[in-house]
Amino acid sequence: MMSSRMPWFYHPYVTRSDKIEHQYEFQFVHKFLSYVQGPSPIYKTIMPLLDKIDPFRTIRVKANLNPRTVKNETREMHTDWENCLTSIYYINTNNGYTSFESGCTVPSKANRLLTFNSNLRHASTTCTDEKVRVVVNINYYSKPTISIK
């Protein structure tokens, strides 16, 4: 994903809100899987990660690349999809992080997988110590569990 051959696409926003006008409010994205577009030509490259998560149904898989900024820029708090799970896989270590409305922060550490209820409001940040901050964001339904008492 850190290769110069990785197809990144410019997005003039980071969250769904188009109200924010800020010089750092953009990112580069690769949608591995989208409910609108289907799988990308390089979808198979993300399969080892999806196999580890083992989702019941995958809704969206996208990689986000945020260029370095002069200071850590915190993005808008948001939720992803309703009533499912979100996993964030951190590609590289940097001083960016994911923050939650509760005040909890999770540092960007390479090969870390963070999983949480998609209804939790969270925000990403940029980094200042590496050229880019790269994560993979996965929204999915987990396999149903049956409990018999």
PLM-predicted stretches and their roles:
Residues 54-64:
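A short coil-to-beta-strand element that immediately follows conserved catalytic motifs
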